[in-house]
Amino acid sequence: MIPIYNQYAKNKSGYLHKDFQLFHLKDKKQQEFEFHYHDFKKIIIFLSGKVTYIIEGKAYLLKPGDILLVDNHDIHKPLIDPSETYERIIIWVNTSLIEAYRSNDCDISLCFQLIKEKKSNLIRLETNSKDKLKSILTELETIMTTDAFGSTLLSKALFIQFMIYLNRIQLTKQPHNMDGAIT
């Protein structure tokens, strides 16, 4: 049973003190989350498991490769089946970073605006799009674990590249990407 959505949730979760933070998590355990929100934007790349994610009262049954966009202050929570390994990449994004890279011909926050217009937080990717984004994320994850010359700047450049491709995908997607919504 899907829990009742509480639009008045007061549970603020997580604090971001840098431009963005990437977490690659893999676990198989009982986890229960309350409805909560963040002051930053959140991108969830679902890799494996059996998870239903509730965002602003809408539930999404996730498939490997799905991407969820959670805008700042959107109330959300995952429902996780503990019998399966849950693997995901989560990126917390500071709104100020997105604002800093806004220009007349490129607004990397557009994908977060489009989720409101399309009434769907889910991006379900085709194979070629998955491969492109996976390649960028793999390189980003590697760079973020090193202190080699230019790693901070390169990680920011890779993140911006990821956001540009994510926006291109979202701009070409038709509303059929709603097929993951179950409520």
Language-model segments: residues:
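Short, solvent-exposed loop/turn segments at secondary-structure boundaries
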Residues: 57, 66, 80-82, 177
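Residues immediately flanking
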Residues: 48, 72, 93-95
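A hydrophobic/aromatic-rich effector-binding and dimerization subdomain
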Residues: 2-21, 79-142, 168-172
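Short, Lys/Arg-enriched, Trp-marked, Pro/Gly-tolerant hinge/linker segments that flank
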Residues: 119-128, 144-155, 164-183
